[in-house]
Structures are given as structure tokens and as C-alpha cells.
Regions:
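Short amphipathic alpha-helical interaction elements located at domain edges
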Residues: 1-108
Length: 108
């Protein structure tokens, strides 16, 4: 019986509003994240949403987020490109985006 592997790439093939929003912001070439990168993106998005709420900003600031996280996360180059593409993403849509990423990551 085959077992699941953690190195399977995440492909954003599910057609949900949050996945469409992700693809719109991040572009087609950034539509794949491995599972570790997905968690890094979600961690950064949580921090970004928290900072946006704290400073009453309508959009997330990825540069401020990465600075706030410091060396806690060693972002891969692919992950950095993905996050950079999400700079300025509407803070009000971050939760939906994270749900979409999790839904694809865990095939729910």
C-alpha cells in the first residue's frame, strides 16, 4: 500500500476564489509550493495580517512582515518570490487565502 510523501508539490488546481486570488497576485509560475513552503507562506500571512490589523492597514506589508519574523523562518527563494508577489494583498482576504492554501495542501 503506497504511503504519502511530504515532498509532493502543491499544485493550485482547485478552482476556489482564494486560489484564483492567489494566482492573480502570485502569477502562474508561482502556483506551486511544496508543503514546507506552504507552511512558511501561511506563517508569514498570519504575521502580515496581524501587523496590518495592529497598524490598521488595508493591505499587508510583506517587507515589514519578513523583518518582524527575523531569522525565525529561513524562506526559500521560491517562497520569497511568492511572498513578494503578495505584497499589498488586501488584509481582509488573507484568511480566505490561507484556507485556500490549506485546502490544496491537504486535499480537503
Amino acid at each position: 500500500m503506497p504511503h504519502a510523501t511530504t515532498s509532493k508539490p502543491l499544485t493550485f488546481y482547485v478552482d476556489t476564489p482564494s486560489v484564483r486570488v492567489f494566482q492573480e497576485f502570485a502569477g502562474e509560475s508561482l502556483g506551486k509550493l511544496d508543503e514546507y513552503e506552504a507552511w512558511d507562506v501561511i506563517t508569514a500571512l498570519c504575521q502580515a495580517a496581524s501587523l496590518a490589523s495592529q497598524y490598521e492597514q488595508a493591505t499587508i506589508d510583506i517587507h515589514e512582515t519578513i523583518e518582524a519574523l527575523g531569522d525565525d523562518i529561513g524562506f526559500s527563494d521560491h517562497c520569497k518570490k511568492c511572498l513578494e508577489a503578495l505584497h499589498g494583498f488586501p488584509a481582509s482576504q488573507v484568511n480566505a487565502l490561507m484556507v485556500g492554501i490549506l485546502a490544496v495542501a491537504f486535499d480537503v
